[in-house]
Amino acid sequence: MEGASRQSLAAARSVLDQVTAVPIGATAGTVAPEVRRIAGDLSAVATLVGGEPTVRRALTDPGAPPQSRTGLAARLLGGQISQGALAVVSAAVAGRWSRPADLRYALEELAVEATLAEAEAADALDEVEDELFRFGRILGQNPQLSLALTDPAAPTSAKVGLVTRLLSGRAHPVTLRLAEQAVADREQGDIERRLEQLSRIAAARRGRVVAVVRTATVLDADQIARLKAAISRFFGRQIQLQIDLDPAVLGGVAVRVGDEVVDGTVLRRLAAARRGLTR
């Protein structure tokens, strides 16, 4: 997303944080149903915005004043979605969007964050983040399973059912819901990358950046601590490590933070040597 869209997403996220916060004296169990409904409502609105070009253009029309766009949202959605979800949608449509399609993607991301807020309230955000990452790695190591979940010819219900059988009772309910949504959304593309993206969103809610570390050997606690400190210093931010065992690395480690790769592996050095020989 470009500047205007990022600012509008940030404004809507601020409202989401307010409507999903656990009130003082309340418990996660008492707020979870409402937060879950907000997440579902935001997902439904994202689907509406994505599937109805006329609605999408009207809700993002830069020529209309913000109050006109929020009024339209209230008329379209009032009484059909929760007050919390409507507040988030109103904040979103009040902003400016670099592209009309960005509103849909923002609402999808906010729906994910609302789902993660439920895990956060239950002090299970770390667990969900790790499970999403691990499930993605399991798919990466099992091509047949990955194909079954991405086969365009397979019914969506069959793919969702497969995820349910794999994770039900083995993962946190929030992890299960997010994984089901990931395989159900045909437009998200690579399911492994989508799961990794969801894991990064979970980490971002805790104010941390995810560093995916590929290594050929198991790292002990001291090595992990030193590596985490070094990467945090390099990027100047708190880092959450996710370790991916990969025999193809051959030695050393390869670190990826978002699209940036810090590669200090034997594999990289061999590749550089090969390039030198071919010149």
Curated annotation (Swiss-Prot):
Coiled coil: none annotated. The keyword Iron does not apply. It is a peripheral membrane protein. The keyword Membrane applies. Its main location: membrane. InterPro entries: ATP_synth_OSCP/delta_N_sf, ATPase_OSCP/d_CS, ATPase_OSCP/dsu. GO terms for cellular component: plasma membrane; proton-transporting ATP synthase complex. It is found in: Cell membrane. Belongs to the ATPase delta chain family. This is ATP synthase subunit delta.
